[in-house]
Amino acid sequence: MKAELCQFCLRSGILCSKCRAKLERGEVTRLDLEIARLLVSIEDKYPLLQDVYFHGAVEADNILAILVRRGDANKILSYGGKIIRFLEDKTGKSIRILEYNTNERKFLEDLFSPLSILTINKIWLPDGTVETRVILKGRKKSSLNVNAMREIAKRVRGITLRVEFAD
Ligand SMILES: [Zn+2]
């Protein structure tokens, strides 16, 4: 697996001076380090992980979003979801795999999966700010943590979501 942290640090958990500086500057967080090391620990079992670029992890409420490069989400989602279950067991969180640098529609589809998106559009507010409205198919599901999803979208993509439901 590739990441902002070097292979030595990912494997040993001991930070070299370069990686420690990244941590101190906030370019890498403790959470990033923790998740990256979990992924590295199962690389031999799931070799597709060797090609995955891990960009970081973002936590909101009980949801942990794992950010990977465009095209890498499927590698983690293969193996019948075993990698997801491993991460859920280890962290106690609900896991989402998101591509941080993909197009906005794909990002939102992955964020709200398995719900399907009917419409995405922009709303310009009188104060000049823009919201991205996402209309999901179905009635509001209590299992969907809308606030956590909004926070993840804000932190990863800088977009303000307005989430609605329609049949
Ligand atoms: Zn290092």
PLM regions and their residue ranges:
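RNA-contacting regions in translation and RNA-metabolism proteins
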Residues: 1-167
